[in-house]
Every structure is written in structure tokens, then in C-alpha cells.
A protein has these predicted regions:
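Hydrophobic face of amphipathic alpha-helices that form TPR/SEL1-like repeat modules
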Residues: 1-32
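ALDH superfamily catalytic-core signature
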Residues: 9, 234-378, 441, 488-490
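N-terminal alpha-helical segment of soluble enzymes
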Residues: 32-97, 298, 310
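Conserved C-terminal structural/oligomerization subdomain of aldehyde/semialdehyde dehydrogenase
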Residues: 34-40, 261, 315, 347, ...
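Residue-level signal for inorganic ion chemistry
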Residues: 35, 71, 93, 116, ...
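Short, well-ordered beta-strand elements within core beta-sheets of diverse protein domains
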Residues: 37-44, 58-65, 151, 260-263, ...
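Long amphipathic alpha-helix in the N-terminal Rossmann-like dinucleotide-binding domain
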Residues: 54, 73-87, 101-126
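Rossmann-like NAD(P) dinucleotide-binding subdomain of oxidoreductase/dehydrogenase enzymes
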Residues: 128-270, 398
Length: 491
């Protein structure tokens, strides 16, 4: 029985002050798997952003005073909504983004729910401190919500990244203006329709449209107390500069070129799956994708040949079909970038082991590409240094532990990475030596709430998916109390 794919409204307005605005100038949102228009959404104006910020500022006056118990209850109710609508949200995310429904059903949507429940839990345990400095002086340290937060989320995980941003900000007592990517705005809009009645007016506001227009205007807006962004390092630098000019903090989760390291004594079958999960999950459109595969020389030929065969078996297909293992890239521009890098690799003398071509035939209307393995003799190749953001992994041979650590760290990025070995001492040595914010050991792309995620070097500033994010959305107030009744005697 064919699935009903008509799961979106025809048009979407903006969510400002708890009210859905009448759709204004409209943009099309496309299904990247077949090129069909899914729905139309509003291209917000500067006045729309002003209204959203004003609503968030007004709502902050009361939202900041709510108790942690009240906020935790709302976060849990939001998680309930996600759980109750798992199939709907999974299908919407799949249609909007192109990723297989088996991923959205098993990962994106459940992880989003878990994120809200996690912050509902940890906010209840937050405490201030009181220090008796001497017999007459007391120092009290409190954390207060930082204010109105401007959040910009990417197209690769629109639903989950919204949860990563919204949950800690709400938990901390902040109000939000959030801007999704113009490539994937629909799943967040649909989600907001379901949870809007749970939140006071103005606490959550959604601005959609072109990043070069409404997104850029947000960066110049003086009404924000903090910015938060997930996306490319290039745009992250731009946002960091904007935040610095306004003297406000920014959380930036940026790009990566992560090393997936396989030693001779790896758990072979599990490692084969881990190499695939590292680069084929979400069609390789993952900031921490294991796009550099380092394999020790003793097992190199066996592992790479087996991996190439596994890549050839991957079922690339319509993402809403249950047996599809890899869906379409998010848009034509991203597919073009991927194919460009395959050509660059060939021009550099790298060998295409498998893949590297756009898929035609029955999938020709969509943005589909073959899972691709490229063999490089050097870590200096552009395909080993530059973020491709697609299902393209560069395979490099290494001899020693010291050599692979040096190559893995030879990157401007430092977001993710993995070590595969049955020797736990080796795993810990290499993990400690890697210049990266997240190291998986004998696994890859596990992203639960409770484990801090963020990058070293140009991969970003700050951490997400952990209670430490509450510190990023709050500011410290110190109340200094003197109980002495006499004059101090200075004057």
C-alpha cells in the first residue's frame, strides 16, 4: 500500500507571539527525492524579525520567573507530543530533507524527544552556591537566564537540531527566535503547530526565509542576548563576528573532517558497519561524518575490499520507503558539490574505489549519488582535508599508532572521530591524543543527550547535548552580603 505523502499544509506563515501570521511572500520547499513542491513557506521581512524579537522580549519578563518545576513539566509535555506523533514527524522530516525514514524513525525523532526529557530532568537539579567568606560576609552565586536567544539551525538535521537548541534554552528560562534553513523549514513549522499551545505567547517564535535576508538581519539585531548556530565553519565565523560586535556570547557547532581509525585488531564485522555508519548516515551530510578512513596496513586490503563490497550493496532509494538505506542529498547544489570533489580527487591522482556518480534511471529526478570510496596516498589531498558533506570517504593506509595520530590531527577541524581496536589501552591512548571534541570507541555517530558534543579548532565554540548547555544560556549573578552592622571605618 502506497504511503500518503500529503502531510504538510499548502502554505505556512510565521509563528510570532503565539500566533501564526498570514503567509506573506512565499518560497517553495522541495522534496529532494523527486523535485516536487511539498509546500510554500514565508520569506520573512525585517519587520517580521522585529516583531518576533519584541514578542520574545516581552515574554521573557514572565517566562524567566517560572519555576524549574513548571519549565520541566512543559518540556516533558513537548516530549510527549513528539512521541505521540513519531510516525508523522519522521515522514515529514524524511520528505523535507531526503534522509531515509528508517533513520528519522529510529534516530532523529526519538533523539529529539530524549533531548527534551533530558533537560526537563537536569534543570530540576540545578543549584546555586553560597560561600561564607568570613564570619560576617556571605557570597551567593545564582544563574539567571541570559535573555532572548537567536538560533539558526541547519538543513541536515532540522528537527533534531531544533531540539538541541530549543530544549536547553527553554529549560534555562530564555525566550527564542529560531530560524531554520530555507531548504528544510517544514518539519520545524509542523512541530511548532503541535506544541504552540503548550508555551506562553512569545516564548518560541519562528522566522523562516532566506538566510541572506532574514537570517542576516537577525545577526544585526540589537535585541538578542545570545546567538546559537549549527552549520558551516565559514558562516560560523560570520556569526561569531556579529556576536562579538554586539558583545554577546555565541555557541557555534561547525564543520568537521573526522578521522575514523581502524587498527589491525579491530572487531572486523562491527567495524565494517561502523565505517558505513560514519559516512553513509544521512547521506554523509553530518558535521562529524567519518569522512577520513585510516586503516592499518596489516588489514588494509581485506578491510577496504570488504568495505567497497558493502558500499555496493547499499540500497539507495526513495527515502520514504522502509527498506531504503540511503536517500537523496538535500538539494541539487549539494549534489553538485559532491560530484565536484570526486573530480578533484581524480585530478589529484586519487583512485575511485567505488561509486562517485549521480544515480539516474528511476531515481533520476532526485538528488541521488552513489556511496563513494576514494583511496588517497596522502592526507594532504583536498578530499582528505576539505569538508565534502556527502557519502564520500577518503581511505588512507597507515603503519603505526604515532603516524595515524599525526595524520588525524593534521586538519583544521576537530569535531568527531573514532578508534576501532580490541586493545582498550590503545583506544584510550589514541583517544587522548586526538585533537577533537568527540571520540567514539568501537562505535560511531551515537548522539544521545547527556554526552557533550562540540568541536576543537575551527569546528566550533561551546558544547551541546549536555547539562553544561544550561551555563551557556544563563549568566552569573553574585549577591554579596555583609552582616556587619558597624561602619567599616574607611570614611
Amino acid at each position: 500500500m502506497a504511503k500518503d505523502l500529503n502531510v504538510f499544509d499548502k502554505e505556512y506563515g510565521l509563528l510570532i507571539n503565539g500566533v501564526w501570521t498570514k503567509p506573506g511572500a512565499l518560497l517553495d520547499s522541495y522534496n529532494p527525492a523527486n523535485g516536487e513542491v511539498l509546500a510554500k513557506f514565508t520569506d520573512a521581512t525585517d519587520a517580521d524579525v522585529d516583531a518576533a524579537v519584541a514578542a520574545a522580549q516581552e515574554a521573557f519578563k514572565t517566562w524567566r520567573k517560572t519555576t524549574t518545576t513548571e519549565r520541566a513539566a512543559i518540556l516533558n509535555k513537548i516530549a510527549d507530543v513528539i512521541d505521540d506523533n513519531l510516525e508523522l514527524f519522521a515522514l515529514q522530516e524524511t520528505l523535507d530533507n531526503g534522509k531515509p525514514i528508517r533513520e528519522t524513525r529510529a534516530a532523529d525523532i526519538p533523539l529529539a524527544s530524549d533531548h527534551f526529557r533530558y533537560f526537563a530532568s537536569v534543570i530540576r537539579g540545578e543549584e546555586g552556591t553560597a560561600t561564607q567568606l568570613d564570619s560576617e560576609d556571605l557570597s551567593i552565586v545564582l544563574r539567571e537566564p541570559i535573555g532572548v536567544v537567536g538560533q539558526i539551525i541547519p538543513w541536515n538535521f532540522p528537527f533534531l537540531m531544533a531540539a538541541w537548541k530549543i530544549a536547553p534554552a527553554l529549560a534555562a528560562g530564555c525566550t527564542i527566535v529560531i530560524h531554520p534553513s530555507s531548504s528544510t523549514s517544514l518539519s520545524l513549522l509542523s512541530f511548532a503547530q503541535k506544541i504552540n499551545q503548550l508555551l506562553p505567547k512569545g516564548v518560541l517564535n519562528i522566522i523562516t526565509g532566506r538566510g541572506s535576508k532574514s537570517g542576516e538581519y537577525m545577526l544585526r539585531h540589537k535585541g538578542f542576548n545570545k546567538l546559537a548556530f549549527t552549520g558551516s565553519t565559514e558562516i560560523g565565523r560570520h556569526i561569531g563576528i556579529a556576536a562579538a560586535e554586539m558583545l554577546i556570547p555565541a555557541t557555534l557547532e561547525l564543520g568537521g573532517k573526522s578521522a575514523n581509525i581502524f587498527f589491525d585488531d579491530m572487531p572486523f564485522d562491527k567495524a565494517l558497519e561502523g565505517a558505513q555508519k560514519g559516512i553513509l548516515f544521512n547521506q554523509g551530510q553530518v558535521c562529524c561524518a567519518g569522512s577520513r578512513i585510516f586503516v592499518q596496513e596489516g588489514i588494509y586490503d581485506k578491510f577496504v575490499n570488504a568495505l567497497a563490497e558493502e558500499f555496493k550493496k547499499i540500497k539507495v532509494g526513495l527515502p520514504w520507503e522502509d527498506d531504503t538505506q540511503m536517500g537523496s542529498q538535500v538539494n541539487a547544489g549539494q549534489l553538485e558539490t559532491i560530484l565536484k570533489y570526486v573530480k578533484i580527487g581524480e585530478q589529484e591522482g586519487c583512485r575511485i574505489i567505488t561509486g562517485g556518480k549521480k544515480i539516474e534511471g528511476a531515481l533520476g529526478k532526485g538528488e541521488f549519488v552513489e556511496p563513494t570510496l576514494i583511496e588517497a596516498d596522502s592526507n594532504n589531498a583536498r578530499v582528505a582535508q576539505e569538508e565534502i558533506f556527502g557519502p564520500v570517504a577518503t581511505v588512507i593506509k597507515f603503519k603505526t599508532e604515532e603516524e595515524v595520530i599525526k595524520m588525524a590531527n593534521d586538519s583544521e577541524y576537530g569535531l568527531g572521530g573514532a578508534v576501532w581496536s580490541k586493545d582498550i589501552n590503545r583506544c584510550l591512548r589514541v583517544s587522548n591524543a586526538l585533537e577533537t571534541g568527540r571520540v567514539w570507541v568501537n562505535c560511531y555517530n551515537r548522539l544521545p543527550a547527556g554526552a557533550p558534543f562540540g568541536g576543537y579548532k575551527t569546528s566550533g565554540i561551546g558544547r551541546e547535548t549536555h547539562k553544561m548547555m544550561l551555563a551557556a544560556y544563563t549568566q552569573v549573578k553574585n549577591i554579596y552580603i555583609s552582616t556587619r552592622e558597624e561602619r567599616e571605618g574607611f570614611y
